[in-house]
Design a protein with these regions (language model features):
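Acidic, surface-exposed loops and disordered segments
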Residues: 1-126
């Protein structure tokens, strides 16, 4: 075997091995990252928590999840913005945060309806 053939076979083998390794790493499913989607609607018996388990998966700006939920009153969910998660530099008027909270509410409404519950939504209560 001459030197040129040896180098081409060795180089080709390295490329094939590297490609296989990258392909394996890129195609792995992160079980821990997907756990919330597997558990949504399953681990809670209480209807509010069941609907909220879906709502927390709602799309939100920069994955900040800017919501706080108060369940202290029976049969009521109070949604508030977590001011520590605002984006003052990229979203000075909180437009993106408002859209994210709207997505949260819509997913909660859909999840509640799917389980046979109606939601009376009072936006911006006093």
């Amino acid at each position: 075997m001459n030197r040129r053939k040896f180098l081409s076979l060795t180089g080709g083998g390295i490329i094939v091995a590297a490609t296989a390794t990258v392909g394996t790493i890129a195609s792995r499913t992160p079980a821990l990252a997907l756990a919330p989607w597997d558990q949504a609607g399953v681990i809670y018996d209480e209807p509010r928590k069941r609907a909220l388990s879906y709502a927390i998966l709602a799309p939100n700006p920069h994955n900040r999840q800017p919501w706080m939920v108060d369940l202290s009153t029976p049969d009521q969910v109070v949604l508030r913005v977590d001011r520590d998660r605002l984006l003052p530099h990229t979203d000075p008027f909180s437009r993106q945060i408002t859209i994210g909270l709207g997505c949260f509410l819509e997913v909660m409404l859909i999840a509640a309806a799917e389980n046979g519950y109606a939601v009376d939504l009072d936006v911006f209560p006093e």
